[in-house]
């Protein structure tokens, strides 16, 4: 489990990206790189890192489900993810 402070920091970055998205898009279309440079560093979506919604783990993230591979395996084994079954052939 990730520390709460790390999860909160990531949520704060996400909020900053969303707040400046429209302004950032307008500056990019206008080619105003000086204006882009004046935006906060955390306003760039490149600085975001996907994290598991349940544990906050940053690695092994599965975009389709929003959780990491370890949590996915546990939930899938318990039948808690609809439509997911174990492979058998």
From Swiss-Prot:
Q: What InterPro entries does the entry give? A: Ribosomal_uS14, Ribosomal_uS14_bac/plastid, Ribosomal_uS14_sf
> Which Gene Ontology molecular-function terms are recorded?
rRNA binding; structural constituent of ribosome
GO BP annotations of the record are: translation
Q: Which residues form a coiled coil?
A: none
Q: Which Pfam families match?
A: Ribosomal_S14
Gene Ontology cellular-component annotations: cytoplasm; small ribosomal subunit
Entry keyword set: Ribonucleoprotein, Ribosomal protein, RNA-binding, rRNA-binding
The protein's job, in short, is:
Binds 16S rRNA, required for the assembly of 30S particles and may also be responsible for determining the conformation of the 16S rRNA at the A site.
PANTHER family (alphabetical): 30S RIBOSOMAL PROTEIN S14, SMALL RIBOSOMAL SUBUNIT PROTEIN US14M
* Family the UniProt entry places it in: Belongs to the universal ribosomal protein uS14 family.
Q: How does it assemble?
A: Part of the 30S ribosomal subunit. Contacts proteins S3 and S10.
Q: What is this protein called?
A: Small ribosomal subunit protein uS14
Question: Which species is the source of this protein?
Answer: Cytophaga hutchinsonii (strain ATCC 33406 / DSM 1761 / CIP 103989 / NBRC 15051 / NCIMB 9469 / D465)
